[in-house]
């Protein structure tokens, strides 16, 4: 019986590496792929950060694939990523909203490119290291939370279509993170099994989105400078550093002392004001 070919999305981290190990043990033929999405050299953080967009991670993914015995390709999609994910990310902040770039990436970039690459490389399926499962009901597929609820990633995948799900494998869906680390250790990857996890946005490995906006938006400081904090009656409470520096629900880091906790409940780009209230919602 001919082996099914799987396009394995490799990040160089423990999850995609263990996912690849499991698929190989199940008899699949793997083709690895890592997409170069963003060049952090422009932000001066390549040397100090090891985010999934770094050159280090690209070559770590290739090294893991080679050690496990399957071919691996690095594909450059930086322009597409910038035009879609980064443009949306910047645009949402400038409209006073907080973006979720992972959802945008999964729906418009990642799965689309994976399916496209899988077709080009004659792969039957694609696989990732997400902690998620796929269920079946009434002839349709649906996303299920991963067995490890603390690592469940279905929220970022809610936009996947029936076609996407029909071609997707989630080898880690039934496992906990502890079990994944143990598998890596048992396969001789002790260092990988102890590797920490990144919680940052992949193209902002230092988690400083404010500096990122200032670097990416022309004349940012002049266009999005200081404005006013106001209360629900319109009374001025103090000055802020520019509305894109704040998010709905934010309480800490406002830079003003009001004698009681205050939350950002609305952001108005049109007049550069941030509305504050004593609870996260005026209905509370």
PLM features per residue range, with description:
Residues 228-232, 236-250, 255, 267:
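Oxyanion-binding "anion nests"
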Residues 162-232, 238-240:
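Contiguous mid-protein beta-loop-alpha structural module that forms a pocket-lining wall or clamp
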Residues 135-140, 231-233, 268-271:
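Short acidic-glycine loop/turn motifs at beta-strand connectors
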Residues 1-158, 169, 177-180, 185, ...:
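ATP-dependent adenylation/nucleotidyltransferase module used to activate substrates
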Residues 272-276:
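A generic structural motif
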Residues 151-152, 209-214, 283:
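Short, charged/polar, Gly/Pro-enriched secondary-structure boundary elements
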Residues 277-284:
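Conserved small/polar residues in nucleotide/adenosyl-binding loops
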């Amino acid at each position: 019986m001919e082996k099914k070919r799987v396009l394995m999305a490799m990040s160089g981290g423990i999850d995609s590496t263990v996912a690849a190990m499991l698929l190989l043990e199940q008899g699949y033929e793997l083709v690895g792929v890592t997409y170069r999405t963003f060049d952090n050299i422009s932000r001066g953080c390549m040397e100090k950060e090891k985010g999934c967009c770094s050159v280090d991670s690209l070559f770590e993914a290739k090294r893991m694939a080679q050690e496990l015995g399957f071919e691996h390709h690095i594909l450059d999609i930086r322009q597409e990523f910038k035009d879609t994910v980064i443009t949306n990310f910047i645009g949402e902040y400038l409209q006073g909203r907080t973006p979720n770039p992972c959802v945008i990436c999964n729906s418009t970039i990642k799965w689309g490119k994976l399916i496209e690459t899988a077709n080009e490389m004659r792969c039957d399926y694609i696989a990732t290291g997400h902690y998620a499962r796929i269920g079946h009901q009434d002839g349709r597929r649906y996303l299920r939370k991963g067995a490890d609820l603390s690592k469940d990633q279905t929220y970022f995948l809610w936009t996947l279509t029936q076609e996407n799900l029909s071609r997707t494998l989630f080898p880690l869906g039934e496992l906990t993170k502890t079990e994944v680390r143990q598998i890596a250790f048992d396969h001789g990857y002790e260092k990988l099994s102890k590797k920490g996890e990144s919680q940052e946005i992949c193209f902002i490995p230092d988690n400083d989105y404010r500096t990122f906006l200032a670097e990416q938006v022309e004349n940012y400081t002049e266009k999005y400078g200081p404005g006013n904090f106001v209360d629900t009656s319109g009374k001025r409470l103090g000055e802020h550093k520019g509305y894109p520096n704040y998010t709905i629900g934010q309480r800490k880091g406002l830079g003003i002392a009001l004698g009681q906790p205050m939350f950002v409940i609305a952001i108005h780009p049109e007049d550069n004001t941030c509305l504050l209230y004593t609870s996260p919602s005026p209905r509370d």
